Amino acid sequence: MDASKYVRYTPEQVEALERLYYECPKPSSLRRQQLVRECPALANVDPKQIKVWFQNRRCREKQRKESSRLQALNRKLTAMNKLLMEENDRLQKQVSQLVYDHGRHGVAAAGMMRRVPAFPPQAAAAAGHQLATATDTSCESVVTSGHHHQQQQHNVVQPPPRDASPAGLMSIAEETLTEFLSKATGTAVEWLQMPGMKPGPDSIGIIAISHGCAGVAARACGLVGMEPAKVAEILKDRPLWLRDCRSMDVVNVLPAGANGTIELLYMQLYAPTTLAPARDFWLLRYTSILDDGSLVVCERSLSSKQGGPSMPLVQPFIRGEMLPSGFLIRPSDGGGSVIHIVDHMDLEPWSVPEVVRPLYESSAMVAQKISMAALRYLRQVAHEDTRSVITGWGRQPAALRALSQKLTRGFNEALNGLADDGWSVIESDGVDDVCISVNSSKVIGCNATFSSGLPIVSTGVLCAKASMLLQDVSPPSLLQFLREHRSQWADSNLDAFFASAMKPNFCNLPMSRLGGFSGQVILPLAHTFEPEEFLEVIKLGNASNYQDTLVHRDLFLLQMYNGVEESSAGTCSELIFAPIDASFSDDSPLLPSGFRIIPIDSPLDTSSPNCTLDLASTLEAATPRSRISGVNGGGGTCAAAAASSSSKAVMTIAFQFAFDGHLQDSVAAMARQYMRNIISSVQRIAVALSSSRLVPPGAAAAAAQLSPVTPEAATLPRWICQSYRFHFGAELIKSVDANSSNESILKAVWHHPSAILCCSLKAMPVFTFANQSGLDMLETTLVALQDMTLEKVFDDQGRKNLCTELPNIMEQGMACMEGGVCVSSVGRAASYEKAVAWKVVDGDGGGAHCISFMFINWTFL
């Protein structure tokens, strides 16, 4: 048969070819020949033609998949376009309403102004007093702001109280439905697009926050590839997707009309920080189907205003109020559902300290933590249902979500320390704000064993927690640094303690330092559909020499990192981890610990702060060659940082420790000290990171930003120059003298072309300061510099020279060393022409402060 001619295949031949195609879409020549031998029907078909058939078949399959993808994208774009048109119509109605209100108030104001001159002064004052106290809020009698007008109208026009009968509850439900729909699709609330959120085919949806209404409110609209009934089922199960939800109990269920239900719910929400109590809600939820087939679920709080059954207050919860809220779910023409979500609450901000009050007055926070969380969860589940999702370590997506939920819930439970969970507070020593709570009822080993078969024997859990205020530091950047540089804040013996905490005799671990870790390896496990959350396993290489077969050399932590987006308003960033056994089973007990950072003011506030910076923060802690210029490898990070340079955030830290009963006091003391060390390390890192956002480009601008500085930042460069002049009889920097200002000396030392390093006077000297050139030579930052020892910088010959010259430095105060080679923090060699060292003395009593080294004419090899 001529291979160049068209071939018409019989059904038997097509069946044989299709069978092989599904087994192997791209068979080799030998495999095609084998097919011809096995199928006599293909004997008269040229082998080249069979090859062409498979090529065409692969092309058709590729075209089919591409066509299906384009059709799905077209349906999505069509539905999104329809949603945007509806949103545009709603905005036009809102604009028309605002224009009408403005004109009406303008006419009323003009009429009042014409009447004012006719009044004597005393009569005008009396009339003004009457207007201020009048209860009539019509436009002819008083002109008020929209917000005040709404409040007065709300206070005046009160519905009559309803009883707890089915008819009374139905009346409340219908009123709730009307108010919810007016917010979801009408103009009852003035909605503003949330900063950082733009609608589009790849966006999560249309996100808006309220402006000028009572309480805090958020609205989200989006497309989800699931049927309305399944969407409603998921959204009604709030603990499934809202990680701050501690519990939600259905107290009573009543039928309501055709396929409708009324439910009475009691819901508890965890507090996000130690500085505020948790919230609870007593709710009525109404589920019904509208005339157009849309499914609606609306909720509101039951109180004395609406009537209905009451729920006694529960200590220590603060009773919040949910204003008419809910979900409107419509089937989409192209499949799936169009969802409108409204969350409108009054979180009683009066009940929290002023420093965290903005958290409870932030609509952006409600949008991020509730409205957008619901959309993200739905999109994640829909993505997993329609595609074959492959995750690490053989885990199904649902199992990984359960692990994330378990980490967050365990962290929230420890953070809140509620009595009905078994927690009690240990009396503080009064030195700081570290709170220690104990849960003796949390016996972890009741039904659990490790893979070795040994039972878990800890008899209680202790939690050390504290909150601190951060200023001028990006929460995602800070947590990213903590994630990637665990050695900067973690103590190796506590990491070993974490990993061994639930093993037999774990509390016999010595409290002295076990040794350093050789490093950490981050093993990705999974991330959500929108890459705002990562789940990973941290492998810590343990260099400990502790003689215990139960302490593995490799320690494992399950870690969750979320809130990585820097441009989104109200984003909460978290780094939560828990020690895991090598078996990593789904039912293993977890003791989550970690960090949570919540911004507490507007990211659009760009007022210039007046900060006091220490030496490390003054000279910054960014990457080499970017510390003063402000250049950052993160691309848009600098712009976002500049836009929020005066931002504030609350950081909450909580660490859990399993313990045996008789060791509670010693474990509590260890945990308190460990928490203090972590707070100190985090403050040091935060100050260093904040300075890299505050110093603008240009040396002149940098010099202007260096004032005021702390005494250490102001005096150390002066001491370096004075000591150099004393020992060598020459000026280290020709352009400065004893009369120069501290800022000019600091700037000159920072920009000196030679690498200047200072190290401590200890048995194992560590670096405490380096100028720009020194940090470049060592390829490190000021934060990481403090973990580098002097001996690691030199090669073998350099270490020998150092040992020879070190006594001279201590006795004579100075020494000169020949040229040699040093090694950077990443192992790169750098040669220097010569090096000098001198003892730096303080300016008061002449005591030795540190040793300075200067490497002249250095260059990388």
Curated annotation (Swiss-Prot):
SMART domains: HOX, START
Cellular location(s): Nucleus
DNA-binding region: 2-65
A GO MF term: DNA binding
Keyword Transcription belongs to the record: yes
Record flagged with keyword DNA-binding: yes
Gene3D superfamilies: 3.30.530.20, Homeodomain-like
Subcellular location, principal: nucleus
InterPro entries: HD, HD-Zip_III, Homeodomain-like_sf, MEKHLA, START-like_dom_sf, START_lipid-bd_dom
Domain START: 162-390
GO cellular component terms listed in the entry, alphabetical order: nucleus
Reported tissue expression: Expressed in roots, stems and leaf blades.
Coiled-coil annotated residue ranges, if any: 57-99
UniProtKB keywords: Coiled coil, DNA-binding, Homeobox, Nucleus, Transcription, Transcription regulation
Stated role: Probable transcription factor.
Family of this protein: Belongs to the HD-ZIP homeobox family. Class III subfamily.
Protein name: Homeobox-leucine zipper protein HOX29
Organism: Oryza sativa subsp. indica
